[in-house]
Amino acid sequence: MPKLKTRKAALKRYKKTATGKFLRRHAYKGHLLMKKSKTQKRKLSQIICVSNNDSKPIKLMLPY
């Protein structure tokens, strides 16, 4: 049986924790930041866990 390929786009976006959950960054933090408030930018900088429903397809994309 051939080896499973890792989706490189998912590898760049998600990080797997020791418990098997995935971490991700917030959207809307790339550009056009002058019109956003400091509070909004600070909250968008935090890293959050992916929900359980969204983590199932990520597990298929990141087999190792």
From Swiss-Prot:
InterPro entries: Ribosomal_bL35 (IPR001706), Ribosomal_bL35-like (IPR021137), Ribosomal_bL35_CS (IPR018265), Ribosomal_bL35_sf (IPR037229)
Main location: plastid
Gene Ontology BP, a term: translation
Keywords, ordered alphabetically: Chloroplast, Plastid, Ribonucleoprotein, Ribosomal protein
One GO cellular component, as annotated: chloroplast
GO molecular function annotations of the record: structural constituent of ribosome
PROSITE patterns linked: RIBOSOMAL_L35
Localization, UniProt: Plastid, Chloroplast
Xref: PANTHER family: 54S RIBOSOMAL PROTEIN BL35M, LARGE RIBOSOMAL SUBUNIT PROTEIN BL35M
Sequence similarity: Belongs to the bacterial ribosomal protein bL35 family.
Protein name: Large ribosomal subunit protein bL35c
Organism annotation: Trieres chinensis
Encoding gene, per UniProt annotation: rpl35
